[in-house]
């Protein structure tokens, strides 16, 4: 597919054109870049105006220049005096609201896709610079290219200011999603976790071909052994790689860690060669490699034959804001985690010492010593993208509200990589929320239930030793030795 240069006002964009698709798809790409709706676009190619339905009479050549005309909104009229006063009055409020991250418009049952994109866009390694996007285009994968463009648009503060918080309409990405994965029919509700897994498989593969080892950031490695409970027979160790852990939900599961362990330790019936019959076996799985980003699917849906739907388990499953995976790991990995975990105690002691010191210093001096920690590496030196402590901080959640995976509503709750605040991304609506709202999504009713969790490796800081504390003036005066006075002879 040819790559062309599109000039619009003072901007210039490099766009890949698929002439096998209707021109409306190309105009949707331009809309994603400029926010000029297709109805207001006038695209001129070699003196001809491009229509919406076909490319008849128009030939697209590599690196050719295409002109586009059209404004984002209505052509503004000269403001009246009252309008100028109102604009000045609202300027500060508009700038603050414009800095809120952009939402994604629901194009018709596309909330499942929007929540996945809002989750992945907070993974800093997936947000590329414009020059880096060119390397993605070289692999002729339109879905990955459109997703990379979408991640950038959602993290672009300048774009947010220009659009004043207007939501992005992800036409191009939705169209190419269904092309790459036919199970996601256009504008039909789908399973958000299935969508997330599909997007991650595409992105990790194409980014990897382009020189970025994204796969290592999500890869979990497990070791599984099987032991016969009726003999001494033990199966060979099986090593598997996955991009996600599963929390199985049953009547005994109330906490996330319990549900994960339920899948790691199971009894089952299988053939025993030693006994020459079926026997009971114990399966034991342990994690031998932890990634920087850990995704966990709370397995809330099951196929209900009577209604022929993926019905939802409404049971509450509590999840932590800080997750410790140490007990899920193999002994070999546990031994490797010990060193960085010891740094956590040192970090906590240093923070406590600084809190006490701040009480005897002014605010400016106290802030300086409190923020003097240096972040330690979160990965092992010989394993990029790993987690060397076993500790994670919750970064985001995809929740579902409804009774089956094919209906209801999906939203994303994300902690910003920039300001650390939690925000609810409900399609085009973006609001700031607190941790209490996050913890309420554990389930147990018809409210939003956590379905997919994204954890990020905890950043541990190393603090320098503080200088001796200054002695308060009053104390120094009280403890000073009395001066000797000589007696007159």
Curated annotation (Swiss-Prot):
The stretch of residues making up the signal peptide is: none
Query: What residues sit in the active site?
Result: 111 (nucleophile), 409 (proton acceptor)
Q: Which UniProt keywords apply?
A: Hydrolase, Protease, Proteasome, Thiol protease, Ubl conjugation pathway
Query: Coiled coil: which residue ranges?
Result: none
Carries keyword Hydrolase?
yes
Instruction: State any single GO MF term.
Output: proteasome binding
* Disordered: annotated span: 467-489
EC number from the UniProt entry:
3.4.19.12
Q: Which GO terms of the cellular component aspect does the record hold?
A: proteasome complex
Its GO biological process annotations read: negative regulation of ERAD pathway; proteasome-mediated ubiquitin-dependent protein catabolic process; protein deubiquitination
Q: Which reaction does it catalyse?
A: Thiol-dependent hydrolysis of ester, thioester, amide, peptide and isopeptide bonds formed by the C-terminal Gly of ubiquitin (a 76-residue protein attached to proteins as an intracellular targeting signal)
* Role this protein plays: Proteasome-associated deubiquitinase which releases ubiquitin from the proteasome targeted ubiquitinated proteins. Ensures the regeneration of ubiquitin at the proteasome.
Regarding protein family, the annotation reads: Belongs to the peptidase C19 family. USP14/UBP6 subfamily.
Q: What is this protein called?
A: Ubiquitin carboxyl-terminal hydrolase 14
Q: Name the species this protein comes from.
A: Caenorhabditis elegans
